[in-house]
Amino acid sequence: MPIAFISMYKVILSKQAIKDLEKLKRAGKSYAKKAKELIDIVKDNPWINPPSYEKLVGDLQGFYSRRINDQHRFVYAVLPNDCNFVDEQGIPLQGIVHVLKMWTHYE
């Protein structure tokens, strides 16, 4: 029986993250590619290392960050699946990853 890999988390991009992804595309193909790789990683497991992540403090407490490059960070929060989202096969997801932004460092 083949093993199927199932995305365990639903990824939701904020309006800002969608705009940031467009900026990354215009800034260089490799930036957008890295952002999409990070989306795929957190879709499967937002706690996996590598690439390393950092727990944020202050105004961004409750969020985590991963490096896109020296200047840009992928900032996200992991939320419980209170809405009972399921994947394409009807299997309940573990949670929701809310991507806040992807352009510049923390503000």
What residue ranges belong to the model's regions?
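Enriched for short, Lys/Arg-rich terminal
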Residues: M1-K10, E22-L24, A32, I68-R73, ...
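Short functional linear motifs
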Residues: I18, K29-A32
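Residue-level signal for pocket-adjacent positions within structured domains
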Residues: K19, P51, K55, V97
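Alpha-helix C-capping/helix-to-loop hinge sites
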Residues: D20-A27, F63
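Residues in soluble alpha-helical coiled-coils and helical-bundle/repeat scaffolds
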Residues: R26-K29, W47
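PIN-domain endoribonuclease scaffold, especially VapC-family toxins
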Residues: A32-D40
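A short, surface-exposed loop/turn module that caps and links secondary-structure elements
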Residues: D40-R67
